[in-house]
Amino acid sequence: MSSRLIVILALLAVVAAASAGIGTWITVQPEPASGSGAAATDTPSSEERRRHRDQFFGGDSNREIRGGQEMKPRW
């Protein structure tokens, strides 16, 4: 085998090992060590998400929006 082929195979092996390690790291999220101070993040429940969405996008239901101010161009 030529030295060029050996170098290419070695680089491919390093890239494959690195990508496998990164894929494993992303797939298997490591748990924080006990007592490390890293708090586990809890995802909000669907009820909390719905309440937040209604509060953010809800608007004022008592406000009259018909016949509002005329929009005029600035130029």
Swiss-Prot record:
Residues 1-20 form the signal peptide. Keywords: Conjugation, Plasmid, Signal. InterPro entries: Conjugal_tfr_protein_TrbK (IPR020065), TrbJ/K_C (IPR024475). Pfam families: DUF2749 (PF10907). It comes from the Bacteria. This is Conjugal transfer protein TrbK. The lineage of its organism: Bacteria, Pseudomonadati, Pseudomonadota, Alphaproteobacteria, Hyphomicrobiales. Residues 61-75 have a biased composition (Basic and acidic residues). Residues 28-75 are annotated as: Disordered. It comes from Rhizobium radiobacter (Agrobacterium tumefaciens).
